[in-house]
């Protein structure tokens, strides 16, 4: 399970991108002794930029992942996303994402750069979405992933809506408060 808090340091203006962090806490839900998960809480600490222009969003930055478990490593990562809003319900994006070695116990023992495609479908009830993504490595260790999920958010999106939604990164869901 993933929980996160978005903190904005500089708000987006006409010629200035938003600057902030989206600190994530990965809560263990699997049985570590059976190879299901890391077995401890681990963290993502990024610095992110975001700029909107009409139906387009550019989003990117870099961060550091802290994984306090034997056999895993702390490592840097970076990513850049281009997203397009198509109507009131659908968002599609393409992302370039790279990470360093994650440790010998992780599936990703070497560095990798991936390209992924994905998006959100927003249901009628605000704050409920269907997420989907597929990614494959283009450099480094071979990686392949597919993701589908249901996503619930709460909080304010700064526009008077009861839930805030932003797609900010790789491999699926994140919670956001603004």
What are these regions (language model features)?
Residues 17-20, 37, 50, 60-63, ...:
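Small-side-chain structural scaffolding
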Residues 81-178:
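Outer membrane beta-barrel transmembrane domains
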Residues 1-73, 107-110, 156, 165-169, ...:
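Outer-membrane pore/translocation modules
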Residues 1-7, 35, 78, 84-85, ...:
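N-terminal short leaders/motifs
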Residues 15, 32, 43, 64, ...:
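Sequence-level detector for tyrosine residue identity
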Residues 57-97:
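A mid-sequence, solvent-exposed acidic-amphipathic segment
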Residues 1-5, 19, 41-47, 76-80, ...:
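Hydrophobic, lipid-facing positions within transmembrane beta-strands of outer-membrane proteins
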